[in-house]
């Protein structure tokens, strides 16, 4: 939706090895690696590429990577430019491909933080599994009936996905209510603009539920780039399968821990780690002595599965299964056992013995959903009553987490309060928001064993916040190290707000260096709505009249007249009507191109922070339009001025 200048490489052959989204991602990684010391030499590459998780870190150690790089270019003191870096990247990828061949690890991203892998290969087994999943969960959809079921042995999936409807529907299966389906363009024949709107809605909504989509654009979906599309699908399905792996959805998980301190630790774990902990908890009830640490090599012999299912479904237990010597035969018996339990599964015995991490995780998640074997007694659950269940804190934590994860894929956190405590990711985020501000020479990289080094990092975080004029009267570095929730959220809000205001300042060429304020955003929004002939007004970002969502729909209609179907808008009187309008507002904003991380409840409750970010995101999208003309800041009419420069738009508020 925004302007985009492609990254050019002087060597045509090298240029043709990558898509523009890949070049953009690799350029971002390269710039980030170079930024630490101002230059990048061959000797630096191995460690910095490993830290940035650019190339197959699950397959190459730093030592292996360093050896390969040295073999390719022995002079370690030479400085690395971007094209040299691309050639190194291709060589390492070729080596990784040679190792994994057509086997287990040759698959789309699923367990990884990043949504899409840059390997241009996909696993047919995974594709078939995801198609089976889609056929199962979307079989009753009225619009998709004409193209379902999809043939898992063909590439029909990527054709069906091209109009964006299937991906939007799949997101709603994973996290119900994320997309207001009234906002999806579902005509039988979509024009390019309508199709692009669906893709934009899909990608912004995927970001909003926790997917990282930095390597994929709307054009990739249109072109049916299989490895990229499958990467998005796999993460959406993963989010669905792991949705119950938290104490809110499954309070019985408290049985896995001993006291309230352990409960807090459990709450901070990513869902796949909780799933592993649950699996080992059940296995301790058997004679199985090993600890399962992954969904690949540790389950390849199917022994862990045999014991797990014997515990969960003893009525189908057969002692002879453990005596089977062939892993493949044992895997087949495991799947028979799962079938008898009524547990739907989409993997084969071959997938188990080959250790497919994505499909094994999906299999265990299905088992957990079907029969978790946890106590329904309330005795252990009493621990939960002693924990503060602050819904607002949980909601803001999720918004800030997804915001941090949305930058460029080089940073990924699972829990704001745990993953930011050493200060390193906060420093990285500060450097993205205000490039060059961090003094990397006095910063310590993880793993950080000495506590005072964490405090030093966090002290710099606080110092830089004050430099950016944050209000940090009661915040010290040690508060971040200690995981003080309210103070961390207060810092992150100011960091997000600074990011938004700087983006707007960069786009408003007529600001003459003037800082943009909350009042400027408020006046811009009111002027837009007023000039569109509407009488509604927002008096502040706390204005309770915003709860019906109508003002934001009028704002969206003023910046893109065809965006709102007013026949779908309610009066916003009852709670249900307000929720319908709020959901519609969020979906229309994402459909235009706004990357926003809020829930309908934030609009209904008039969450001041989220009202500001929503308005600013709509303003930012409007100012980025290539033909949009603007007057100086504070002008009531923003339809005159000069063309905008969109070169600063590589950010998470889009």
Curated annotation (Swiss-Prot):
Q: Where is the Calponin-homology (CH) domain?
A: 124-241, 269-372, 394-500, 515-623
Is Oxidoreductase a UniProt keyword of this protein? no
Using the record for this protein, list the coiled-coil segments as residue ranges, or answer none.
Answer: none
Which Gene Ontology terms of cellular component type are present? cytoplasm; cytoskeleton
Q: Which UniProt keywords apply?
A: Actin-binding, Cytoplasm, Cytoskeleton, Repeat
Does Cytoplasm show up as a keyword for this record? yes
Residue ranges of the region described as Actin-binding 2: 394-623
Pfam families noted in UniProt: CH (PF00307)
Q: Which domain of life is it from?
A: Eukaryota
Chief location bin = cytoplasm
| SMART domains the record matches | CH
Gene Ontology annotations of biological process type? actin filament bundle assembly
Compartmental location: Cytoplasm, Cytoskeleton
Its Gene Ontology molecular function terms? actin filament binding
Which parts of the sequence are annotated with region: Actin-binding 1?
A: 124-372
Q: What does this protein do?
A: Cross-links actin filaments (F-actin). Stabilizes and prevents F-actin depolymerization mediated by profilin. May regulate actin cytoarchitecture, cell cycle, cell division, cell elongation and cytoplasmic tractus.
Concerning PANTHER family, the annotation shows: FI19014P1, FIMBRIN/PLASTIN
Self-association and partners: Interacts with F-actin.
Q: What is this protein called?
A: Fimbrin-2
Source gene?
A: FIM2
């Amino acid at each position: 939706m925004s302007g985009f200048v492609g990254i050019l490489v002087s060597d045509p052959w090298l240029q043709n090895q990558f898509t523009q989204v890949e070049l953009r991602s690799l350029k971002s990684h390269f710039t980030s690696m170079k930024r630490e010391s101002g230059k990048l030499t061959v000797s630096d590459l191995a460690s910095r590429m490993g830290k940035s998780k650019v190339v197959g870190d699950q397959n190459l150690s730093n030592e292996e990577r360093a050896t390969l790089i040295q073999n390719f270019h022995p002079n370690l003191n030479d400085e690395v430019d971007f094209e040299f870096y691309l050639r190194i990247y291709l060589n390492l990828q070729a080596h990784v491909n040679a190792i994994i061949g057509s086997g287990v690890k040759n698959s789309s991203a699923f367990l990884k933080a990043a949504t899409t892998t840059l390997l241009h290969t996909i696993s047919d087994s995974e594709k078939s599994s995801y198609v089976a999943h889609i056929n199962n969960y979307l079989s009753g959809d009225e619009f998709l009936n004409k193209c379902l079921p999809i043939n898992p042995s063909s590439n029909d999936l990527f054709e069906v996905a091209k109009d964006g409807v299937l991906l939007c529907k799949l997101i709603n299966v994973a996290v119900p209510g994320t997309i207001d389906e009234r906002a999806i363009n579902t005509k039988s024949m979509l024009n390019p603009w309508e199709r692009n709107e669906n893709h934009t809605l899909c990608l912004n909504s995927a970001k909003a539920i926790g997917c990282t989509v930095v390597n994929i654009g709307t054009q990739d979906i249109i072109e049916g780039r299989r490895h990229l599309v499958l990467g998005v699908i796999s993460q959406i399905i993963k989010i669905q399968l792991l949705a119950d792996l938290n104490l809110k959805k499954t309070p019985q998980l408290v049985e896995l821990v001993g006291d309230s301190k352990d409960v807090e630790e459990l709450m901070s774990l990513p869902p796949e780690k909780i799933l592993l902990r649950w699996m080992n908890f059940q296995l301790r009830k058997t004679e199985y002595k090993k600890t399962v640490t992954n969904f690949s090599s540790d389950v390849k012999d199917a022994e862990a599965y045999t014991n797990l299912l014997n515990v969960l479904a003893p009525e189908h237990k057969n002692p002879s299964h453990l005596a089977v010597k062939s892993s493949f035969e044992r895997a087949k018996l495991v799947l028979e056992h799962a079938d008898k339990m009524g547990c739907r599964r989409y993997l084969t015995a071959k997938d188990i013995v080959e250790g497919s991490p994505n499909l094994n995780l999906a299999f265990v998640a299905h088992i957990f959903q079907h029969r978790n074997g946890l106590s329904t007694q309330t005795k252990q659950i009493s621990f939960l009553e002693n924990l503060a269940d602050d819904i607002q804190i949980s909601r803001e934590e999720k918004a800030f987490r997804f915001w941090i994860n949305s930058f460029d894929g080089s940073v990924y956190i699972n829990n704001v309060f745990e993953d930011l405590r050493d200060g390193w990711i906060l420093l990285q985020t500060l450097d993205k928001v205000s490039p060059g501000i961090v003094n990397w020479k006095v910063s310590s990289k993880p793993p950080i064993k000495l506590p005072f080094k964490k405090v030093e990092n966090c002290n710099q975080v606080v110092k830089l916040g004050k430099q950016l004029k944050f209000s940090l009267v009661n915040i010290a570095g040690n508060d971040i190290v200690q995981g003080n929730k309210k103070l961390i959220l207060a810092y992150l809000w100011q960091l997000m707000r600074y990011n938004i205001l700087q983006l707007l300042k960069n786009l408003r060429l007529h600001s003459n260096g003037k800082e943009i304020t909350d009042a400027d955003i408020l006046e811009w929004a009111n002027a837009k709505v007023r000039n569109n002939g509407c009488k509604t007004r927002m008096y502040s970002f706390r204005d309770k009249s915003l709860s019906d969502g109508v003002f934001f729909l009028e704002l969206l209609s003023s910046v893109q007249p065809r965006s709102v179907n007013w026949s779908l808008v309610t009066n916003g009187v009852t709670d249900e009507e307000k929720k319908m309008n709020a959901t519609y507002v969020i979906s229309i904003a994402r459909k235009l191109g706004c990357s926003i991380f809020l829930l309908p409840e934030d609009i209904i409750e008039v969450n001041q922070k989220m009202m500001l970010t929503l308005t600013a995101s709509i303003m930012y999208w409007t100012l980025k339009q290539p033909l949009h003309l603007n007057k100086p800041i504070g002008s009531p009419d923003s339809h005159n001025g000069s063309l905008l420069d969109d070169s600063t738009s590589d950010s998470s508020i889009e």
